[in-house]
Structures are given as C-alpha cells and as structure tokens.
C-alpha cells in the first residue's frame, strides 16, 4: 500500500509539473512580440530620389543605392546614419535600364523621429577636391574605415547597386531584365 501511495504521488507530481510547464510556455507565447525595428533605407532612398535626384535631368527612373556603414541613435529616437549613397537616373529602352546620369554622395544623414516614422533633417557630404579625404575622415569619424573599405570594394558596390536596381524593378513591376552603363556590357538582374 505504501509503494502504491508513493507511486501515485510521483505520478501526480509528474502530471502537475507537466501541466505547469505547459502553462508557462503558453504564457510565454502569449506575450506580445517586440516591435520590429523601422528600416531606414527606404526613408533615405526616398530622400535621395526627391532631393538629390532633382538636380539631374529628368529620366524614366531615379534609383538610389543605399549602403549603411553605421548608425547612432539618440535618446529622443533620432538617428544618425553614416553611409555610401548613389543616385542614378535611367532611361528605359526595351528590357534595359540605361544609366544616363548620376552621382556618388557618401555622407552622414540626420534622421528625425516623428512617432513611428522618420524624415531626413540634414545631409552632410565631404568637401570636393583636395579636401575630400580630410573632410570625409572628420565627417565619418569612427566609421571612416568601414566606409573606405566598402567604397573601395568594386564587387560589393556592384552587388549593392544591382540589388537596388532589381528591387526598384520589382517594386514598380517593370518589364526589365538588365541595366547598362554607357560603353559597358549590360548586367543581368537577378530574378528573385
């Protein structure tokens, strides 16, 4: 009888333990998920197309390429973004986007938080000419080496550019399979 009582108590303890652990897992699963971080790249791309792109002759498409090398968030939620940015304009010829103009804009953007959204409040770029390196070092600070590494890596820049163009083509449902720079062979866009 004593063995049966001990066995019964062990079984009840096991059932109680399993029941409580199942409840705690259900309670954990019921917790609200953390808020997904807001992607800053679309905010930056929209700014580049609207504000920097307007300085170029009109074309069929203005496609920014955004590469973020570092970010810093202030206590008020504003974000400083250090990056390598390109703005390029393309004309559509059959299934090809032909690059007709554009420019390189490495720099630092100040993004102001307003509720759940951001807007670009300020955009600083290095000085042109002989003071470029000196002003880029000052502007990028601790992110200078990361920016320099990316900006001198042709393969990485081409990969980022191709992705930006492919994303634009997909988002705008264009019948485009490639892009081309003047005097160069076309580059086939990924289909995924």
PLM regions: where:
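Bacterial N-terminal signal peptides that target proteins for export
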Residues: 1-9
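Bacterial signal peptide processing site
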Residues: 24-26
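Short, non-transmembrane alpha-helical segments in secretory-pathway proteins
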Residues: 34-62
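C-terminal motif of bacterial Sec signal peptides marking the signal peptidase cleavage site
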Residues: 18-22
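Repetitive helical segments and hydrophobic/amphipathic motifs
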Residues: 12-13
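Low-complexity, intrinsically disordered terminal/linker segments enriched in charged
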Residues: 121-192
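Mature extracytoplasmic domains of secretory-pathway proteins
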Residues: 65-130
């Amino acid at each position: 009888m004593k063995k049966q009582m001990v066995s019964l108590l062990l079984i009840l303890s096991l059932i109680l333990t399993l029941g409580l652990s199942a409840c705690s897992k259900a309670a954990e699963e019921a917790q609200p998920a953390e808020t997904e971080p807001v992607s800053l790249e679309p905010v930056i791309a929209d700014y580049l197309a609207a504000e920097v792109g307007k300085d170029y002759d009109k074309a069929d498409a203005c496609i920014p390429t955004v590469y973020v090398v570092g970010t810093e968030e202030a206590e008020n939620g504003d974000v400083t973004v250090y990056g390598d940015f390109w703005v390029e304009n393309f004309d559509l010829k059959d299934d090809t986007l032909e690059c007709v103009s554009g420019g390189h804009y490495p720099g630092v953007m100040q993004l102001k938080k307003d509720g759940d959204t951001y807007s670009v409040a300020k955009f600083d770029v290095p000085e042109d000419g002989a003071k470029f390196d000196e002003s880029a070092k000052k502007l990028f600070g601790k992110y200078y080496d990361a920016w320099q590494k990316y900006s001198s890596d042709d393969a990485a820049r081409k990969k980022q550019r191709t992705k930006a163009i492919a994303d634009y083509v997909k988002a705008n449902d264009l019948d485009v399979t490639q892009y081309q720079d003047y005097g160069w062979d076309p580059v086939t866009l990924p289909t995924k």
